[in-house]
């Protein structure tokens, strides 16, 4: 299971908010798209790990 660092995530969201306040909407949207892609990749890794068959000693 992946470990999402809540503090790091909050910092990245804060950065996007700062960019929005500065008026650079294109960069803010781009940063949100990057963050979304990274979070979806983490979720996909979690789902892939959960779907792997367990070894007989793990059942």
Swiss-Prot record:
It holds the Pfam family YciZ. Transmembrane segments: none annotated. Signal peptide: none annotated. NCBIfam families: PRK13658.1 (NF010179). It comes from the Bacteria. This is UPF0509 protein KPK_3153. Belongs to the UPF0509 family.
């Amino acid at each position: 299971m992946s470990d999402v660092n809540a503090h790091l995530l909050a910092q990245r969201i804060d950065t996007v908010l700062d960019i929005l306040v500065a008026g650079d909407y294109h960069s803010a949207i781009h940063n949100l798209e990057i963050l979304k892609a990274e979070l979806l990749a983490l979720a996909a890794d979690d789902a892939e790990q959960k779907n792997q068959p367990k070894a007989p000693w793990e059942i």
